[in-house]
A protein has these predicted regions:
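Short, hinge-like loop/turn segments at secondary-structure boundaries
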Residues: 51, 68-69, 115-119
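Catalytic cysteine-centered active loop of the rhodanese-like fold, especially the PTP/DSP P-loop
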Residues: 64-109
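Short active-site oxyanion
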Residues: 28-33, 48-49, 71, 96-97
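Alpha-helical scaffolding within the catalytic cores
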Residues: 56-62
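Short hydrophobic/charged patches on amphipathic alpha-helices used for structural packing
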Residues: 22, 62-63
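Flexible, polar/low-complexity N-terminal or interdomain linker segments that lie immediately upstream
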Residues: 1-33, 39-44, 117-130
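Short loop/helix-cap segments at secondary-structure boundaries that form the rim of catalytic
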Residues: 42-48, 108
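Terminal peptide-recognition signature
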Residues: 21, 35, 50, 91
């Protein structure tokens, strides 16, 4: 039983769902959203306020001005993409506090939140059913 409890506690320590991210941003918590995809994907569509830092470019130079006290949330396209996992790993290796957005931008949109970019969506704010 204790192993299962630890597993789920650990999982919640490293992941965040779109509803929790939206709430944290709405409360102006010290959260920085990182789109870990390549620039062309970011320009097409991204979470409002997100910065684009492809996981392949994450290093001590590209993150030198980042706030070390912030919580960083990395995302990518969704479950068929591992850029957010790679980005979260890279940022963690660089000493940042990081979580991965469950489902990426696809689940962000499924929950009804708006996006920015050339193919932005207005958002419907359906909300989390959990």
């Amino acid at each position: 039983m204790q192993t299962a409890i630890q597993h789920f506690q650990d999982k919640l320590s490293f992941e965040m769902d779109p509803s929790d991210l939206f709430e944290a941003l709405a409360k102006n918590e010290n959260v920085i959203v990182i789109d870990a995809r390549r620039n062309f994907a970011y320009e097409k569509e991204h979470i409002p306020g997100a910065i684009n830092l492809p996981h392949r470019e994450m290093n001590s130079q590209t993150t030198s001005g980042f706030d070390r006290s912030a919580l960083y949330v990395a995302y990518c396209d969704g479950i068929g993409c591992n850029a957010s996992t790679r980005g979260a790993l890279n940022m963690t290796r660089l000493g940042f506090n990081v979580r991965e957005l469950i489902g990426g931008i696809e689940w962000w949109k499924l929950d009804g939140y708006q996006t920015e970019g050339a193919n932005h969506t207005a958002g419907l704010k359906i909300g989390c059913a959990c």
